[in-house]
From Swiss-Prot:
InterPro entries reported in the protein's UniProt record: CCA_bact, NT_sf, PolA_pol_head_dom, PolyA_RNA-bd, tRNA_CCA-adding_enzyme
Enzyme nomenclature, EC number: 2.7.7.72
Similarity section: Belongs to the tRNA nucleotidyltransferase/poly(A) polymerase family. Bacterial CCA-adding enzyme type 2 subfamily.
Top-rank taxon, per record: Bacteria
Enzyme class, spelled out: transferase
Organism expressing this protein natively: Coxiella burnetii (strain Dugway 5J108-111)
Role played: Catalyzes the addition and repair of the essential 3'-terminal CCA sequence in tRNAs without using a nucleic acid template. Adds these three nucleotides in the order of C, C, and A to the tRNA nucleotide-73, using CTP and ATP as substrates and producing inorganic pyrophosphate. tRNA 3'-terminal CCA addition is required both for tRNA processing and repair. Also involved in tRNA surveillance by mediating tandem CCA addition to generate a CCACCA at the 3' terminus of unstable tRNAs. While stable tRNAs receive only 3'-terminal CCA, unstable tRNAs are marked with CCACCA and rapidly degraded.
SUPFAM superfamilies attached to this UniProt entry: Nucleotidyltransferase (SSF81301), Poly A polymerase C-terminal region-like (SSF81891)
Name of the gene: cca
Gene Ontology MF terms in the entry: ATP binding; CCA tRNA nucleotidyltransferase activity; magnesium ion binding; tRNA binding
Residues binding CTP, per UniProt: G23, R26, R106, R152, R155
Annotated positions binding ATP: G23, R26, R106, R152, R155
UniProt name for this protein: CCA-adding enzyme
Pfam families: PolyA_pol, PolyA_pol_RNAbd
Amino acid sequence: MLVFYGFLSSRSISHLKVYLVGGAVRDQLLGLPVKEKDWVVVGATPEEMTARGFKPVGKEFPVFLHPETHEEYALARTERKVAKGYKGFTFYAAPDVSLEEDLKRRDLTINAIAETPEGQLIDPYGGQEDLKNKVLRHVSVAFQEDPVRVLRLARLATKFPDFSIHPDTLELMKKMVCAGEIDALVPERVWQELNRALGNEKPTRFFTVLNQCGALAILFPEIKMEGKGMAALQSVTDKTPSPLIRFATLQSDLPPEIIQKLAGRYRVPNEYADLAILVARFGSDYVNLNRMDETSLLNFLLKTDALRRQERFDQFIFTCDLISSTTSSQPKKIKEIIKAVKSVDIKPLQEKQLKGEAFAKALEKLRLEAIRTLIS
């Protein structure tokens, strides 16, 4: 028994044919921690599941949440392609669908292994052998019917960087791209897979795989495999696990307006887009801090909003330092300057009842004096 953890005694699943499937079985076989568990139920109806206390959550096919563990239990199903895109499917879920039929619709053989309550592995498509040989291989030609599988495989390749892609699988991916299936991907799903890939062991491989099948030029025409941003991402991978920092690093060589377009196209969270644009726009200025006089330094702080958004600015200087890959006194220096500027006493200005432009000019003068004193 691998990861059933004693839930067999639960009244909710007693006498049901329940199997652990997918990534949980795969990761356990690889000796990796299991973060999520997915279950398949064979021979049951939706009515039987709800009668046992399961909460239906699936809109397109029967998926239920366990009343105690809140893990997902899906009825065994088959699927048939009826239109382009990842939503172009009809599903059949009924008591007569076998476990083997359910496993056959899955993307990769290493994700098509099931485990019985007794710990027996059911592996009709050779997933264990592919795990042993470190191969990412499709279960059936139905792989080419769902464009999301291109993204998922690319993302999985970042998690398992020493796994190769089976030549036949790569050929299917190329056919999908040529058939225009990639064009049907929705922005949210592209971003979801990219963000997860950025947090994995080798994020650059996400783009390598997309490039190999021809999808990179369609999904991310701004990103070049030979670009400085890709090289920077490769160099910082072992220094930070943060998808946020890695995203900004990847685009550090792009014009800010191009980053904005990419972020808008895939509905990238503002936190990611803002940092990436900040690094692209002001990264070179940060590297040259030592050459700036007090006026340039103050302008730099104001343009980067360093005085108001300290956390984002800290992320900015951290990213810039990683990209430059040199140890310097820049972070300490700029933080001292920020502290000095923030410490400026404005009470005398208030006592003089200065307002508007007069107040702004007087405040600027005090800030410049504070910086000048520090750097002279």
